[in-house]
Design a protein with these regions (language model features):
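Conserved alpha-helical scaffold segments that buttress catalytic/binding sites
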Residues: 2-332
Length: 332
């Protein structure tokens, strides 16, 4: 029998961390973070392939999959300093998007109620309507604020006549009362959608959307400073949703709806680090990685690093130690 090992086996976990089974609560009892894959792209409007995203993200690394990743800047190990387990991919029937999202909603609620932070690997962005809802079912509707990185607002009233799709989840979350519109922030929007009617709806909900031109001229640091004050007002936790197409397609080509003029990979990683260091994050999803359109796995590697950045920063926040981005790393 051939032993492929943790890195190349037919079923491998995120960088070799322990497995768990959501049907066996004891297998993730006491976990700080549970990673779960949502391999579905039935909600896409253009290029499919995001259903292959979860495993691409899990394997997006050139180092041994040994369940350890010391962070050079933060001096923490997000996979060791936290108890992180991987539940594998959910069974999500591609022909029934509504049923698949119900499976995800139940799974994220179960993880949240266990006391762990769900980290969901997508999959297309339709999954946000389910994973955020699952956490809100536990913590309370309107008690979870949201920070959403994306080239697109995803606030469509419908998607080619369908209420569920990767262009509508943020509208569904607000209309269904899971997230308050005035505690919903978006960063990285650009391009040629949505239309003025949808923008008016977003304004009426109290949403705050930072288009890339504003971010460029004001600076990402100033935008994040302004965002953080809003996110923690009247809410018990923050959900971080990262659509990889927020990054310029020159740095993240492997996605379904690429839009030029986006963030750099460094900007995204620094933003994720700050969010997870400074805010009470209760859930994360990383979506729209479409390996068939990737080049040399650079999009999958970036998505992998988004997850690692978040876990490392959460570990740093929990251990209470200080961090200065301008300090010499040898003196930390």
């Amino acid at each position: 029998m051939v032993n492929h090992g943790n890195m190349y086996g037919p079923s491998f976990t995120f960088l070799g961390i322990p497995q768990c089974d959501l049907d066996i609560p004891a297998s993730f009892a006491g976990a700080d973070v549970v990673i779960v894959g949502a391999p579905i792209d039935s909600g896409t409007s253009h290029r499919s392939g995001a259903k292959f995203g979860p495993q691409a993200i899990r394997g997006g690394d050139y180092l041994p999959h040994d369940g350890s990743r010391p962070h050079l800047a933060l001096r923490t190990d997000g996979l060791k300093d936290l108890k992180v387990v991987d539940a594998g991919d959910l069974m999500m029937p591609g022909g029934d998007l509504v049923a698949s999202l119900a499976v995800l909603r139940e799974a994220t609620e179960k993880i949240s109620r266990s006391g762990a932070i769900p980290v969901i690997l997508g999959g297309d962005h339709s999954i946000a309507s389910a994973d955020v809802a699952g956490i809100a079912n536990h913590l309370g509707r309107g008690k979870v604020s949201m920070i959403h990185f994306d080239a697109h607002a995803d606030t469509g009233e419908d998607q080619f006549g369908a209420l569920v799709g990767h262009g509508t989840p943020m509208r569904r979350l607000i209309e269904d009362g899971y997230v308050r519109g005035d505690r919903f922030l978006q960063l990285g929007l650009r391009g040629y959608w949505p239309d003025h009617v949808t923008l008016a709806w977003m304004r009426d909900q109290g949403m705050r959307s930072y288009e890339m031109t504003e971010i460029h001229h004001r600076g990402l640091t100033a935008v994040l400073d302004e965002s953080f004050a809003t996110l923690t007002d009247g809410c018990d936790g923050v959900f971080l949703s990262v659509d990889i197409d927020v990054v310029d397609p020159g740095m993240a080509p492997g996605t379904g709806t690429p839009e030029p003029g986006g963030m750099t990979s460094r900007e995204l990683l620094e933003a994720v680090r700050r969010i997870c260091l400074e805010l009470p994050v209760v859930g994360i999803d990383v979506v729209e990685v479409a390996p068939p359109f990737d080049s040399a796995d650079i999009t999958a590697i970036l998505a992998n690093r988004v997850v690692l950045e978040a876990l490392s920063a959460i570990a740093k926040r929990r251990n209470g130690s200080t961090y200065s981005p301008t300090q010499n790393i040898l003196d930390r």
